């Protein structure tokens, strides 16, 4: 599985470069374009040629997000940039030249981004440290040490006051922890995992908090975490396709699920709406291009999906406005 993940990342990079030229050959418009009546594309930045992957993505308040991306810019320069996304517009805040910040689970607290781990350069294990990053002044400091080592996958749920971490170790074992960022305290949870829940890292951008519970979109299934009973069980619904690294975004009408890729690196354009209250799943649209491994957020009116990987241009922010 580890070798497969590395090969997948390599293919995703090649697809992203190919997608950039293919998309441009169709005459895409600069800045922004209206694809359908409820999907719009806006450029991450005017000088970004290709998106090469995400670093972190956090919600600051009801209308503002902070994010980092690895991008190829004009002049063939690769940069790690930090942007503020507000009301459908991205604003360059600075640069974050820290190599381990690659698809890192993160949350926002007290004007800082808490980064949970990250890639260990030259090593398949992840960094066992929580860092606090201030995007306004560019400072980074060690915030807390995580109570576990030798892990290669991590997914995070944030309920607004406490984080829940779901960890996969190198030997394939799974564990869950709660983390109080105000007390800087971790606690190991006595949590059983349902059969088939094996790759929490593939749900990194598909783990959401919705009405008091956590939800993981995991392949063609959805796992439900109840913090009161410390249970993790499968929802009584299945997606019609099995894709990994989907995007999930919680809204006031349910959880929207976007894209993803399968074991053969075929990407999806499907958009689904899952309503946990009645366990219904409905296909509600199509992405403008195949996309996976992209973070997303909801500002109360629109859903934003940023960067990601796939055969599309990946230099856009997809803005999806739910109908109705």
From Swiss-Prot:
Disulphide-bridged cysteine pairs: none
Keyword terms, alphabetized: Kelch repeat, Repeat
InterPro entries: Kelch-typ_b-propeller, Kelch_1
Kelch repeats: 112-160, 254-301, 303-323
Superkingdom to which the source organism belongs: Archaea
Presence of the UniProt keyword Nucleotide-binding in the record: no
Keyword hit for Repeat: yes
Protein name (Swiss-Prot/TrEMBL): Kelch domain-containing protein PF0436
Native source organism of the sequence: Pyrococcus furiosus (strain ATCC 43587 / DSM 3638 / JCM 8422 / Vc1)
């Amino acid at each position: 599985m580890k070798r497969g993940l590395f090969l997948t990342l390599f293919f995703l990079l090649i697809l992203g470069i190919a997608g950039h030229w293919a998309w441009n050959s169709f005459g895409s418009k600069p800045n922004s374009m209206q694809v359908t009546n409820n999907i719009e594309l806006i450029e991450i930045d005017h000088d970004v040629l290709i998106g090469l992957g995400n670093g972190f993505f956090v919600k600051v308040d009801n209308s503002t997000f902070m994010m980092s991306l690895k991008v190829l810019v004009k002049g063939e320069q690769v940069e790690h940039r930090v942007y503020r996304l507000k009301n459908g517009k991205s604003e360059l805040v600075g640069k974050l030249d820290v190599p381990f910040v690659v698809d890192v689970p993160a949350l926002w607290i007290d004007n800082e981004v808490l980064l949970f781990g990250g890639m260990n350069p030259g090593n398949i294990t992840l960094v066992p440290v929580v860092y606090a990053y201030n995007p306004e002044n560019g400072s980074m400091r060690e915030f807390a040490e995580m109570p576990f080592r030798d892990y290669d996958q991590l997914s995070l749920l944030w309920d607004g006051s406490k984080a829940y971490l779901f960890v996969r170790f190198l030997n394939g074992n799974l564990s869950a922890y709660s983390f109080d960022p105000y007390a800087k305290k971790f606690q190991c949870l006595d949590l059983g995992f349902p059969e088939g829940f094996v790759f929490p890292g593939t749900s990194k951008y598909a783990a959401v908090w919705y009405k008091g519970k956590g939800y993981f979109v995991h392949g063609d299934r959805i796992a439900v975490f109840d913090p009161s009973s410390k249970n993790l069980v499968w929802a009584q619904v299945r997606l019609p396709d099995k894709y990994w690294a989907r995007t999930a975004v919680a809204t006031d009408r349910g959880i929207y699920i976007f894209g993803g890729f399968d074991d053969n690196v075929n990407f999806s354009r499907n958009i689904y709406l899952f309503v946990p209250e009645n366990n219904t799943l409905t296909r509600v649209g199509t992405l403008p291009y195949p996309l996976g491994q992209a973070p997303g957020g909801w500002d109360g009116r629109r859903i934003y999906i940023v960067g990601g990987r796939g055969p599309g241009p990946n230099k856009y922010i997809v803005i999806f406005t739910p109908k109705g």
